[in-house]
Amino acid sequence: MKKAIDVQAAVAIASLEAIAAKTQGTFGVGGVMLDSFGSVLQAVHNNVIRNGLVYDPTAHGERQLIDWYYAQSAKGRALPPPHEITIVTSLDPCCMCAGAILAGGFNVVVAANDRQAGVNHEGDGSFTALPEGLREQARATFAYPAVLGSSSYARTAIGATPPPFFIGKTIAEPTQALCSLVFEATAESVTGLFDADPPREQLRDPGTLPPEHPIVRALKRTCPDALTYRCTPQRPDAGLAPYLQHAARRDRAQGGPGDAVVLLDAFGNLLLRCHGQRSQSAIRTAFMECTRAYAQLRYKLMEGATPAQQDEVRQYLGHPRDGTFVFAQGPGDDAAGFMNLGAYGSTMEGPLPAHNPAQFQYVLPALDEARLAELCADMPPLYRQRIGTRPMQVRDAALVAALRA
């Protein structure tokens, strides 16, 4: 089994994964998972984009490594506990990945800084982007090793001390520069792929399609309840309650807290109803399942299709920013809640449209409105400025009462 017994060697592996990601046409980020002896357990790169299409907005390196860890454990593979595992990433974790790392209890060693979306975007190890209750854990487990040199890529060590199995605890300046430049070379072009969908006025109602249409059949395979509920756009009502309640029961059966999320389209049609898979992975929340399922539904319909067929898919299954995610439970200030907020940002990847300011809705609050607004305002610039993440409670009192009962 390959080993990386100094930080530089581990970051070099992550940088090679980042180069592979760039070659694939996705965000140039990579990561590697090590045990407490420095043995390489797994190495992956970002997989948000495949074949020029959005494949999975949650497929960042760190998130993939964590789900891989839990999947291997579920298969019976003997792996060390998370606190003995170290994830080495070529780029500062985003909010989704930081939440996933903290939820699992892993250690992390970070190469390049990310001033826009990184959890340490301020660069001082204060982690003010995190909810206050998570900051101390981050300071104890997130390491930003020294980069020796005189260029803008040099830095002093910040955060936790890298795990003791690392003999060398610094990053070479050229490797740090490579990690930064590979990401910078891909960020704009990849983000642009999230804007390939038509505007709201060009969308078509999938509820008008015949049952045998390939889009309807694919929807029904993914979610048998698709197109069986409809409300005024952006105004979920009490009719949605049974769908959320059913998903919440299934979530509890899977070891979750009663998590449930539905995706409504721009016309108010129910497209997906999802629960978490926490018995399989500590980070497979209902929202992570929902946003991934929708992206992969669209990807499978568009992969290998003609441009005209791809356009049809995008017209009937628009970008989520034109629809509404409805959570049974609002975001909390725990690691999973922060991960969900981050994953929402990774799904949007751009500003919410002016016609749909209430894209992110929840039925029952986990935090009071002021505290939730404060949590969102503390997030890195991508989330609070560019995307404008702002969850809000549904307006329908009967829906709230039904889920509270």
Where do the protein language model's features map onto the residues?
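Short hydrophobic alpha-helix segments
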Residues: 42-45, 273-275
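Zinc-dependent deaminase
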Residues: 1-21, 104-256, 265-405
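Short cysteine clusters
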Residues: 94-97
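Immediate flanking context of iron-sulfur cluster ligation sites
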Residues: 79-91, 108
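Glycine/small-residue-rich phosphate/adenosyl-binding loop
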Residues: 40-43, 64-81
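Active-site-proximal gating segment of KS-fold condensing enzymes and close homologs
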Residues: 52-64
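Short beta-strand scaffold segments in enzyme catalytic cores
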Residues: 29-34, 258-267
